[in-house]
Each structure stands twice: as structure tokens, then as C-alpha cells.
Amino acid sequence: MSEFIVGARGHDFGRRSVEELLSSIGDAGFRCTQLAYTKAVESVKSYADVTPELVAATNAAVQKSGVSIAVDGTYVELSYADEDKRRTEVAKALSQVPVAKALRAGCMGSETTNMAKQPTVSRREAQEALLRSLGEILPVCEEQGVLFAVECVYYHAMNTPEAVKMVLDTIASPNLRVICDLANYV
């Protein structure tokens, strides 16, 4: 039987250096984490701040703490219907594929855009934008051997189990996964 490994969201431990963050997570008894650099690492304000040096420091902290990176939390707005905004968000996600690979992360993870951020856009339009985004991201992930997971949230573009199934069936990529936090359905 497979071993059950318990992890924690890094950003629940506050914004710190990667060394302090992973040490604190390990000291709390966890063996893996969702590391969202822009939410958890004090020196990171944008994905441009995730440098090769920071990735190397993260890998060193992983080795020292014994806390692995289960999810490289790459929070971007994948469902913007505005094409310029959507492409900007896709570029952010694509910039992090080599990071996830270097971290040996279990997967990259993102939510799918709060519908309140684009009140004149229908959920169907937002889901179509999500499909376009994933259609651009997944081929790169497949090429690099990186898994990409989307998280269903009630008030986001991908908001129900049926919407999740539609996305999985439409994209049909072996590298597409789903993060399931049941609290997000209420």
C-alpha cells in the first residue's frame, strides 16, 4: 500500500526566506508543501523574481529540511476572456515550467480565475478562455515532463465537478491533473 504523506501550504506559514519556510514546515511535522513563491517567499513579488539562484536555494532547503515540493503553486488567471490579459497570464505560467522541473515538484498548480474579476464575462466564455490557456500550457508541460493541475473553486471559471470533467475531457492531456479541495465547492 502507498504511504500517505501529509503536507501544508507554504503560505500558511507566512512570508519568509525559503530556508526558514521549509525548516518551519518540517519542524511542524510536514514532509511536503505547496510552495507558491509569490505568496510565501518574502523576496518574491512577481514570477520574474524566481531566479535560478532562488531555485537553487530552494533545492538546498529541500535537502536540508526533508520537505519536498508537492505543488509549485503558480497562481495565474487562466480564464481571462481578454486575450491580451490571458496571454500575459499564460506567459507567467510558462515561465514557471522549468522551475517546477528543477524543483522536482509533483506538479504545478493554479486556480482558474474568480468570476468577479471580469463581471461582464459569462462562465462559458471564461471556461473557453481556460481551455485556450491550457491548450497553450500543456504541450510545454508534456515536452518538459511536468504535470499541471487546476483547482476547482465555486466562484471561479471551473466551478463544479461537471466543469472539471469537461476540462479534462476536452484537453485530454496525460499531464493535466486536478487539485481537489472540497472546501472550494461551497
Language-model-derived ranges and their functions:
Residues 1-105, 124-125, 135, 173, ...:
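N-terminal pre-domain/capping segments
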Residues 18, 119, 157-161:
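Alpha-helix N-cap/helix-start motif
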Residues 3-8, 33, 125, 132-186:
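Acidic/histidine-rich catalytic cores of soluble enzymes
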Residues 100-121, 144-153:
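Active-site groove signature of glycoside hydrolases
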Residues 12-14, 37-39, 75-78, 112-117, ...:
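Active-site-proximal loop/turn and secondary-structure-junction residues that shape catalytic pockets
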